[in-house]
């Protein structure tokens, strides 16, 4: 029979491993979730970056999804409602020509403005993402 401390350590390790597996499976790519498939066009996808052309009509909702560290350039003005995994919501406004940095994030978004939102999003991958941490 194993010593209780070894059993506890094994259980702890299994729990942590399960958490990471679940976290990875819950983090969905924006191009695969409801609303994202129709609104996100991949322009470039290589080992370093993925560049997305995003167009969201008024009222468009994008289901919960994740991004690695990224930069967003707003081609048009934008008014979003952002929902985090814990259910908290906030509104964000951006103006055409504005660029924003974001660390890795999981959220759902909705265009709550009156105009189509057009933005270009550059997601960092590989060494670029590691350097951003």
Stretches with model-predicted labels:
Residues 45, 86-104:
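Short acidic-glycine-tyrosine-enriched beta hairpin
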Residues 10-23:
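Bacterial N-terminal signal peptides
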Residues 25-27:
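Boundary at the C-terminal end of the N-terminal hydrophobic targeting segment
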Residues 67-86:
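Glycine- and acidic-residue-biased ligand/ion/polar-headgroup-sensing regions
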Residues 1-5:
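N-terminal secretory signal peptides that target proteins for export/translocation
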Residues 59-62, 96-110:
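Histidine-centered metal-chelating micro-motifs
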């Amino acid at each position: 029979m194993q010593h209780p401390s070894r059993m506890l350590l094994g259980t702890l390790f299994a729990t942590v491993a399960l958490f990471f597996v679940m976290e990875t499976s819950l983090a969905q790519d924006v191009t695969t979730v409801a609303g994202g498939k129709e609104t996100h066009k991949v322009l470039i996808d290589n080992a370093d970056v993925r560049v997305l052309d995003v167009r969201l009509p008024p009222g468009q909702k994008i289901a919960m999804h994740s991004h690695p560290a990224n930069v967003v350039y707003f081609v048009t003005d934008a008014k979003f409602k952002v929902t985090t995994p814990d259910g908290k919501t906030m509104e964000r406004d951006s103006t055409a020509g504005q660029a924003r940095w974001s660390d890795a994030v999981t959220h759902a978004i909705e265009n709550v403005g009156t105009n189509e939102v057009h933005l270009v999003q550059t997601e960092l991958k590989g060494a670029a993402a590691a350097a951003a941490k």
